[in-house]
Amino acid sequence: MLLAIKDFFNSLLLKELFKGMALTGRYLFARKITVQFPEEKTPMSPRFRGLHALRRYPNGEERCIACKLCEAVCPALAISIESDVRNDGTRRTTRYDIDLTKCIFCGFCEEACPVDAIVETHILEYHGEKRGDLYFTKDMLLAVGDRYEPQIAAAKAADAKYR
């Protein structure tokens, strides 16, 4: 009976309402953490996984040896590779495709690659107007790698002590 009377007076005096308003008032004047994204950028982790790229050796030869480990380890089945044996007995890729609509950006392909051929860059701003625009071919991936090689090499060097 005493508890019922206490609850009645608490609800009559709107105690719960004022507790909620006090909580709201505390956060009303606090520092805002919202970032206006296109204009403002937040700091990016050095291990951020963005757009994929295929790398080349300094002599211009592509690094991928067509071992297909990245294709095998991809949980989303986003990578498809076809290879061919060259005259000197080494294998090279003839087709290397990544479907970014399937990719979950887990980084397993990058970890599995024995020659650091496939990497995930820090590029996060890319788009496609059609589904096919997010289907990256070998030439497109090599172009991304060629364009951003200095940044990729710097990120690899900075991360080398943790590998």
Curated annotation (Swiss-Prot):
Q: Which GO terms describe its molecular function?
A: 4 iron, 4 sulfur cluster binding; iron ion binding; NADH:ubiquinone reductase (non-electrogenic) activity; quinone binding
Which residues make up the binding site for [4Fe-4S] cluster 2? 74, 103, 106, 109
The organism encoding this protein is Cupriavidus metallidurans (strain ATCC 43123 / DSM 2839 / NBRC 102507 / CH34) (Ralstonia metallidurans)
Q: What does this protein do?
A: NDH-1 shuttles electrons from NADH, via FMN and iron-sulfur (Fe-S) centers, to quinones in the respiratory chain. The immediate electron acceptor for the enzyme in this species is believed to be ubiquinone. Couples the redox reaction to proton translocation (for every two electrons transferred, four hydrogen ions are translocated across the cytoplasmic membrane), and thus conserves the redox energy in a proton gradient.
What the entry lists under Pfam families is as follows:
Fer4_7
The annotation note on the cofactor reads: Binds 2 [4Fe-4S] clusters per subunit.
Q: Which PANTHER family match?
A: NADH DEHYDROGENASE [UBIQUINONE] IRON-SULFUR PROTEIN 8, MITOCHONDRIAL, NADH DEHYDROGENASE UBIQUINONE IRON-SULFUR PROTEIN 8, MITOCHONDRIAL
Which Enzyme Commission number(s) are on file for it?
7.1.1.-
Catalytic activity, as annotated: a quinone + NADH + 5 H(+)(in) = a quinol + NAD(+) + 4 H(+)(out)
The yes or no answer to whether the keyword Flavoprotein is present is: no
Q: Where is the 4Fe-4S ferredoxin-type domain?
A: 54-84, 94-123
Q: Which cofactor does it need?
A: [4Fe-4S] cluster
Q: Where in the cell is it found?
A: Cell inner membrane
The record's section on Gene3D superfamilies has:
3.30.70.3270
Q: Topology with regard to the membrane?
A: Peripheral membrane protein
Q: Name one GO cellular component term.
A: plasma membrane
Q: What class of enzyme is it?
A: translocase
How does this chain assemble? NDH-1 is composed of 14 different subunits. Subunits NuoA, H, J, K, L, M, N constitute the membrane sector of the complex.
The entry's family comment says: Belongs to the complex I 23 kDa subunit family.
Per UniProt, [4Fe-4S] cluster 1 binds at 64, 67, 70, 113
Name of the featured protein: NADH-quinone oxidoreductase subunit I
A GO BP annotation:
aerobic respiration
Q: Which UniProt keywords apply?
A: 4Fe-4S, Cell inner membrane, Cell membrane, Iron, Iron-sulfur, Membrane, Metal-binding, NAD, Quinone, Repeat, Translocase, Ubiquinone
